[in-house]
Amino acid sequence: MAAALFVTAVLSTALGAVAGIYNSTEIDLRVALLYALCLTAPLAWRRRLPCTVAVAVSVAFFAGMMARVPELYVGNVALFIAFYTVGAWVDNRRRAFLVRVAIIAGMFTWLLISMFIDATAPTDEGLSRAGLFSPYVAFMLIQFLVNVAFFGGAYYFGNRTFESRRQREILAERSVELERERETTAAQAV
């Protein structure tokens, strides 16, 4: 999966550059490849080291966005997978909670700072900023709500997967116990 996402990230970056994301059609190929590698390679170890992978992917995503790498979609997928995996595979629930809350806090802090910088930057281009619910404010609210849904969904689905896995393990243990009891009962009946 990590390799497929790497190839997709490279293609998405090239297409994003052609499409003019960030109003630029130029991209340093080395930066794009480094971003794609740092973003996707850790996912190969997501079940073995889920917390480390989630932090690494989050840092790579942040760095790529700050460097204005024109790749928006695979980064979101990789971040979702890494974040979800913490909830799904970390047995220490306190650690899973703390890692996910730290990532959420970091991302929302970055989002709010970016919004503030963007809102206070003088510009004649882009969305109108006039009025309480200007197109610009509406766009910023959409960004905020999408991030709430994104992280909330990954958090919820990760927890549900963990609980389902735990219930299956308990059911398997009970099945083994039941089989032992049947064998004991059968041996006593003879």
Describe these PLM feature segments:
Residues 76-184:
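Cytosolic coiled-coil signaling helices that couple upstream sensory modules
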Residues 35-42, 56-64, 79-83:
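Hydrophobic, membrane-inserted alpha-helices
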Residues 13-29, 65-71, 117-135, 139:
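Juxtamembrane/transmembrane-helix boundary motifs at the membrane-water interface
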Residues 52-63, 97-107:
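Central hydrophobic cores of alpha-helical transmembrane segments
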Residues 1-54, 144, 158-164, 169:
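N-terminal signal-anchor/first transmembrane helix of integral membrane proteins
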Residues 184-190:
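Histidine-centered phosphotransfer motif of kinases
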Residues 9-16, 43, 61-68, 110-114:
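Structural signal for membrane-spanning alpha-helices in multi-pass inner-membrane proteins
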Residues 27-30, 50-56, 63-79:
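Subset of alpha-helical transmembrane segments and adjacent helix-loop junctions
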